[in-house]
Amino acid sequence: ETLKSNGVTPIVSGTKNAWPAAAWFDYLNMRVNGPEFHINLMLGTEKYDDPRVKKAFEYWAELLDNGYFIENAASYDWQDVLPFMLQEKAAMYLMGQFVMDSIPEENKADYDFFRFPIIDPAVPIGEDAPTDGYFAAANAPHPEAAKQFLAFLGSKEVQTYVAEELKRLPTNTEVDTSSFPEASKKGMELLAGADYIAQFFDRDTTPEMAEKGMAAFQAFWNDTTQIDTILADLEKERALIFAAE
């Protein structure tokens, strides 16, 4: 409300491609209902028409209905909304660390990040931290060499190089992080303090359910009065998709 009263849009999001909206569902569902329920929903063992899911959507609707998001979010891709922040017309963005790659060097010092706000202190903390991995084909002609190469890619030395060059958090716990930028150290502390690390909506559920879910999130963003209809439709899709698994 303070930001709005000063002519600043509190939150930007570009939902032209649906995945930025999915991040909002991930976090609100984990903050309201806990990461265990969220992941079970992703795995198809909980139902979308469960009152707990509706409760998460109601928190989301409150943010949208109060005008805390940028107007016409569906007309923007995720990078299109960055100028609003650079011009100090907007304040916050739920986005991954990679967003800093699109911020001019001279502006990077102006930006910081914080944990998605806790809604219920009694609920375990879940965080979205999509992890990129390396894989070898099951029928690789040289499986032992492939395993050795994968071990090399996951080694302390290579993980250090990747972290320094790409500015991404390493997965190898032996990497010396003492010389890392403060933002990276802060990110690692944030994840270390989490009770569960999720991978993101479209990675944690099936591709078919992810497609239906993200389309539903876009529809909800445009009309928050349709929660019951949207969740009923998602539940029908969940039942069909996971019955076929």
Language-model features and meaning:
Residues 66, 104-168, 215, 224:
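Extracytoplasmic/periplasmic substrate-recognition and gating elements
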Residues 1, 81-85, 99, 146, ...:
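Short, hydrophobic alpha-helical packing/hinge segments within bilobed ligand-binding/sensory domains
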Residues 5, 194-245:
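Conserved C-terminal helix/tail region of periplasmic/extracytoplasmic solute-binding proteins
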Residues 14, 78, 95-100, 130-132:
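Beta->alpha turn/N-cap motifs
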Residues 71-86:
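Short helix-initiation/N-cap motifs at beta->coil->alpha
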Residues 42-73:
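Glycine-centered hinge/linker elements that transmit conformational signals in sensory
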Residues 12, 91-96, 112:
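Paired acidic/hydrophobic, glycine-rich loop segments that form the ligand-binding mouth/hinge
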Residues 1-46, 61, 90:
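Extracytoplasmic/periplasmic solute-binding protein
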